[in-house]
UniProtKB/Swiss-Prot annotation:
Keywords: Metal-binding, Ribonucleoprotein, Ribosomal protein, Zinc, Zinc-finger. Its cofactor is Zn(2+). Residues 1-16 have a biased composition (Basic and acidic residues). One of its GO terms (cellular component) is cytosolic small ribosomal subunit. One of its GO terms (molecular function) is zinc ion binding. Pfam families: Ribosomal_S27e. Binds 1 zinc ion per subunit. SUPFAM superfamilies: Zn-binding ribosomal proteins. InterPro entries: Ribosomal_eS27 (IPR000592), Ribosomal_eS27_Zn-bd_dom_sf (IPR023407), Ribosomal_zn-bd (IPR011332). This is Small ribosomal subunit protein eS27-like. Belongs to the eukaryotic ribosomal protein eS27 family. One of its GO terms (biological process) is positive regulation of translation. A zinc finger (C4-type) spans 37-59.
Length: 84
């Protein structure tokens, strides 16, 4: 284990492991994503840490269910992280 570490230029892996407030530049862990329904192929915008069950607008199937942290996507759903 090296004693000398560059604190001003940490590696990307080190920064991702840190708590969101202890990073060099603070950034949230949550994001919005576009989820495609496997039945009707409609796209719905969902928060990554959704706290309620999200249903499809077209066919009323469950797209994701809440857990303690991130929402769990239903099997067959595909998603894309939205750019801010």
């Amino acid at each position: 284990m090296p004693l000398a570490r560059d604190l001003l230029h940490p590696s990307l892996e080190e920064e991702k492991k840190k708590h969101k407030k202890k990073r060099l530049v603070q950034s949230p862990n949550s994001y919005f994503m576009d989820v495609k329904c496997p039945g009707c192929y409609k796209i719905t915008t969902v928060f990554s840490h959704a706290q309620t069950v999200v249903l499809c607008v077209g066919c009323s199937t469950v797209l994701c269910q809440p857990t303690g942290g991130k929402a769990r996507l239903t099997e067959g759903c595909s998603f894309r992280r939205k750019q801010h």
